[in-house]
Amino acid sequence: MLPMRFFRNRVFTLANVASLLMFFGMFGSIFLLAQFFQTVQGYSPFGAGLRILPWTLAPMFIAPVAGALSDRISPRLIIGLGLTLQSVALAWIGLVSTPTVPYSQLIAPFIVAGVGMALFFAPVANVVLSAVRPIEEGKASGANNTIRELGGVFGVAVLAAVFSHVGGYQSLEAFSDGMNTAVLVGAAVVALGAVAAFAMPGSGRRPEIEAAEPDPLAQAA
């Protein structure tokens, strides 16, 4: 069972709020962009995936650096910066994507989005784990992973609904209009995640073990 007292810790709660909002905007937008490349610009599914690689591959190179920086700089600043870059990139994509937009105009915002995503991943995991006792890290990690997945699920559902309401598949222009509006909504949601990240307390110390809640493994022994 997930101890509800975890959520009395502002660091844990705000880190998970930021995770929820980040995955909401990111996955909802990637879902629509993959369709944009196929439906509007005529690429195959494989070709669409290749074109999103500047975004999705960046964490492979940047995340280790972000993790190291989080040991020297306040993690909330790195997480907040990552979410800010992600929000800016989504807004950029939402403003320039037309049926005839050259792919070259999307590379820069994709790279910015990838850097933002990379700056977010490792530090937020460290923050979540540092907010609980060592023996409870598994529960905290599981909670964060579940919240991320829920963010992605709701992001795809809500942004797809925005897309359908504003645009649709009637024409290439209708698809672009719907997608751009949905991606801009995603950018706004991720910006709220940045606010949550910057609002996190700066202390990364683990909470003291509470006498009222003894270690269950110690009790069993």
Put a short name on every predicted segment.
Residues 181-198:
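Symmetry-related core transmembrane helices of the 12-TM Major Facilitator Superfamily/SLC fold
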Residues 106-177, 181:
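Small-residue-rich alpha-helical segments with characteristic i,i+4
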Residues 1-139, 218-219:
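Transmembrane core module of solute transporters
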Residues 23, 27, 31, 86, ...:
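Hydrophobic alpha-helical transmembrane segments in multi-pass membrane proteins
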Residues 34, 90-97, 152, 156-169, ...:
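Juxtamembrane/transmembrane-helix interface segments of polytopic membrane transporters
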Residues 200-221:
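Intrinsic disorder in cytosolic terminal tails and internal cytosolic loops
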Residues 58-62, 147, 151, 189:
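MFS transmembrane alpha-helix packing/gate-lining sites
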